[in-house]
Amino acid sequence: MDNSGKTEKFQLHVPNLEELCQVLESGLNKNFSDVKVSVTDCPDLTQQPFGFPVKGLCGKPRITDVGGVPNLIPLVKLDKVYNMNSVSKEVELPGAFILGAGAISFKTAGINGELMPLVLTEAEGRSAVNASYFSSINPEDGKCLQEKYSDRFDDCDFGLLANLYACEGKPGKVIEVKACRRTGEDSLVSCMRKTMAEHYGEKSVALGGTFIIQKGKAKIHIMPREFSVCPLNTDEDVNNWLRHFEVSAPLIFQTVMISRDPGLDLRVEHTHGFSHHGEGGHYYTDTTPNTVEYLGYFLPAETVYRIDRPTETHNVGRD
């Protein structure tokens, strides 16, 4: 795994779950007409519609930001290849369950695309279980092509960048978010992140987890199969390069968000999702505010690990 830079570690503020529920509910009420946030037992995530390789989101929760957008933009750095099993060791949780948002490895796939990681990493006496999905542009019709990673590849590699939530995959108490009918401009994730930023100020609070769009549609993007040969120097350049789609519920998203970057050049939110009808990619927001219904499960992380932080950075292409 390319980890030429050292891994940096930062202890996060971990609010009481009941308190965090109140904070999130208050903020979400400004952006959705019908909101309920509560502490509940994590549902069995091995069941549908999730189909994860573990039952829960609990047990030593932590997040990591691996590589970064500067490995993709303005021009790609193809040598930046990482591995989920190695990441689990870097975040001091060998055998962790990892979910989040990243990019597939060009070295493995021979193309570029969006990765929806769902990996139970290897442990002593146990091989890794890779339940990830990936999306690319179908060369035949230019539409979204979503595939199960293990149907095509047998590794746990990824490329360029990822924002990941790692835990022991155990059942336990989590925060359940129900939000319907969006009245504000922010996406569910942006609203939650901004709400925490406003309430916790200088403290950094991070959440990881999964949410379903049960009704409605969402705007996503998928990166082209080929990397840009011309430098992508502005957000407009990036936007014109990406392929945008409207996709339909039910959609299962994995997200990592942090209220405040503690000086580690973090991507403050990143969300990818899949479906069981062949649509998936990088989430922006819903496109059906009057009918959208969200159901999500989240947990605050205790620590953030910054793996292979780019030496030269910028803020282009982080939406």
From Swiss-Prot:
Zn(2+) binds at H270, H272, H282. It comes from the Eukaryota. InterPro entries: C11orf54_DUF1907 (IPR015021). Its EC number is 3.1.-.-. The keyword Transmembrane helix does not apply. Pfam families: DUF1907. The keyword Hydrolase applies. Its cofactor is Zn(2+). It is an enzyme of class 3 (hydrolase). Its main location: nucleus. GO terms for cellular component: cytoplasm; nucleus. Keywords: Cytoplasm, Hydrolase, Metal-binding, Nucleus, Zinc. It is found in: Nucleus; Cytoplasm. GO terms for biological process: DNA damage response; regulation of DNA repair. GO terms for molecular function: hydrolase activity, acting on ester bonds; zinc ion binding. Exhibits ester hydrolase activity on the substrate p-nitrophenyl acetate, in vitro. May regulate DNA damage and repair by regulating HIF1A degradation via chaperone-mediated autophagy (CMA). Monomer. This is Ester hydrolase C11orf54 homolog. It comes from Danio rerio (Zebrafish).
